[in-house]
């Protein structure tokens, strides 16, 4: 495994953590079978432009793997100069603890190469193949979603602190609750609304909290956040 970064210190720090080697972008482009393009969309063209010759001169097959939001496979191929095999992925931060949700789509990739890719990525979490037309929408839910969940956990902890809980305990309880609730949704196969109703006893405290969230537009705000993220992703892809 080879790592390259425009800031050498960052590459060296990550290499020390993972037990990898550091090198240059050109060296990665010339030697690696699977080349991860981990830059922001607006930086992709500047990254690939000086690598076109190196990629074109390679005698062996390779795959470009892009995680740049909004950039289509066709656009990546255009920037790289040829219709190279490309896998486009949308990871999220929970992948760093093996609990990610990663969507992917590909072009000019063989079934065997796809299986090798899935085997490599499996430790990061769940992977799901989607049509490229849906990957920006998927990213807006699971790619951006962790930030909103962190906000929710923080807000829950704030509420717990306001009611007298120590900060560390409030945060632990909130985070474990979110983890367990998500696990129940995935493993039970039940609709989230059904699971919500099961917690809300008639005249109880939970339904009063649900009422307050509805009064403040909680559901609509979350939906609007996803749509706003989706629109921004589409905008970045045009830049």
Predicted feature descriptions by range:
Residues 21-26, 128:
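Short acidic-hydrophobic, aromatic-tinged amphipathic segments that line or gate anion-handling sites
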């Amino acid at each position: 495994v080879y790592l390259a970064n425009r800031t050498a210190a960052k590459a060296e720090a990550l290499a020390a953590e993972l037990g990898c080697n550091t090198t240059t972008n050109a060296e990665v482009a010339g030697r690696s079978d699977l080349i991860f393009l981990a830059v922001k969309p607006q930086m992709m063209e500047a990254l690939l432009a000086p690598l076109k010759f190196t990629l074109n001169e390679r005698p062996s097959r390779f795959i470009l793997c892009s995680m740049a939001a909004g950039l289509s496979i066709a656009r990546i191929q255009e920037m790289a100069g040829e219709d190279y095999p490309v896998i486009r992925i949308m990871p999220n931060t929970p992948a760093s603890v093996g609990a990610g949700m990663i969507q992917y789509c590909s072009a000019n990739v063989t079934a065997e190469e796809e299986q090798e890719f899935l085997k490599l990525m499996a430790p990061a979490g769940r992977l799901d193949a989607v049509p490229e037309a849906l990957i920006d929408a998927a990213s807006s839910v699971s790619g951006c979603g962790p930030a909103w969940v962190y906000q929710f956990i923080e807000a829950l902890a704030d509420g717990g602190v306001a009611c007298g809980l120590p900060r560390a305990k409030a945060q632990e309880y909130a985070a474990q609750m979110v983890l367990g609730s998500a696990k129940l949704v995935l493993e039970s196969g039940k609709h989230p609304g059904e699971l919500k109703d099961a917690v809300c006893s008639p005249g109880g405290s939970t339904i009063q909290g649900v009422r307050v969230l509805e009064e403040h537009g909680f559901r609509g705000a979350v939906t609007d956040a996803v749509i706003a993220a989706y629109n921004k992703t589409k905008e970045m892809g045009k830049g």
